[in-house]
Design a protein with these regions (language model features):
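Cytosolic regulatory regions built on CNB/CRP/Popeye-like sensor folds
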Residues: 1-124
Length: 124
């Protein structure tokens, strides 16, 4: 994703909600600096799903899907984020497929993790 991460860079301050669950947009983010919390809210309670840091991606499903965001993401500290838009992703996918392999690996790893959690939930 080296080419993609040269795109737009944004700075967000601690506490900023970067992605809101239920919204739809068509970009993903790579964390250049800082940490974020990924969470969901159910019946007025917030559930922390994971924490992400430098080099990690979030929002990647919306590069290929028009579905609503499945979680919210909030800056745990001041962050610098690289924005990957759907047009940039599509251009890279066609011109330089190898450059999107790291992001595709993230997608498959998260799918594998969700499958394992689902199987464990079925067994309990």
């Amino acid at each position: 994703m080296r080419s993609a991460v040269r795109g737009k860079t944004i700075r967000v301050v601690k506490g900023t909600v970067i992605v809101k669950e239920g919204t739809t947009d068509t970009c993903a983010y790579q964390i250049a600096r800082g940490r974020v919390n990924v969470y969901t809210e159910r019946k007025g309670r917030r559930y922390l799903l994971t924490r992400l840091g430098p080099g990690q991606f979030f929002g990647e499903l919306n590069l290929i899907s028009d579905a609503a965001r499945s979680a919210s993401v909030q800056a745990e500290e001041d962050c610098v984020l690289r924005v990957i838009t759907r047009p940039v992703f599509n251009r890279l996918l066609h011109r330089s497929p190898k450059s999107v392999v790291p992001l595709i690996k993230v997608l498959f790893e998260r799918l594998r993790t969700m499958n394992l959690k689902y199987l464990l939930a079925l067994e309990s």
